[in-house]
Amino acid sequence: MPRILSIDYGQKRTGIAVTDEMQIIASGLTTIPTHTLIDFLKDYFAKEKVEAVLIGEPKQMNGQPSESASVINGFVTHFSNIFPDMKVIRVDERFTSKMAFQTMLDSGLSKKQRQNKGLIDEISATIMLQDYLSSKRF
């Protein structure tokens, strides 16, 4: 069974998570500089079977798009032009950064480790993907 990849897109860094081949567990894959994202995805798709890509949809508390939504929507359009056969699934990414930080606290990471913004992005992508997998099962 092909994997599902999750992208927590940011202007500087992008967190990436992926499922196992059975699409049961989401695991953090990496955080990369955003300007290298398309090349990273080309390489990854050449090596691994991926059936869909989850991309966070930033929203405000009232459900309206956040200020960064236009940048991410631009990326989604660009992504779809480069990978026209790849299914894109948009998911609400509200609170994922806060949940990622809380996960880091609960894991006992040091203050210095918790300041690693790249790790927060990777954990955020993992949380989005695991939430999606959980919702798919019900």
Swiss-Prot record:
One of its GO terms (cellular component) is cytosol. SMART domains: YqgFc. InterPro entries: RNaseH-like_sf, YqgF, YqgF/RNaseH-like_dom, YqgF/RNaseH-like_dom_sf. Keywords: Cytoplasm, Hydrolase, Nuclease, Ribosome biogenesis. NCBIfam families: RNAse_H_YqgF. Its EC number is 3.1.-.-. Disulfide bonds: none annotated. It comes from Flavobacterium johnsoniae (strain ATCC 17061 / DSM 2064 / JCM 8514 / BCRC 14874 / CCUG 350202 / NBRC 14942 / NCIMB 11054 / UW101) (Cytophaga johnsonae). Belongs to the YqgF nuclease family. Could be a nuclease involved in processing of the 5'-end of pre-16S rRNA. GO terms for molecular function: nuclease activity. The lineage of its organism: Bacteria, Pseudomonadati, Bacteroidota, Flavobacteriia, Flavobacteriales. GO terms for biological process: rRNA 5'-end processing. It is an enzyme of class 3 (hydrolase). Pfam families: RuvX. This is Putative pre-16S rRNA nuclease. Signal peptide: none annotated. It is found in: Cytoplasm. The keyword Nucleotide-binding does not apply.
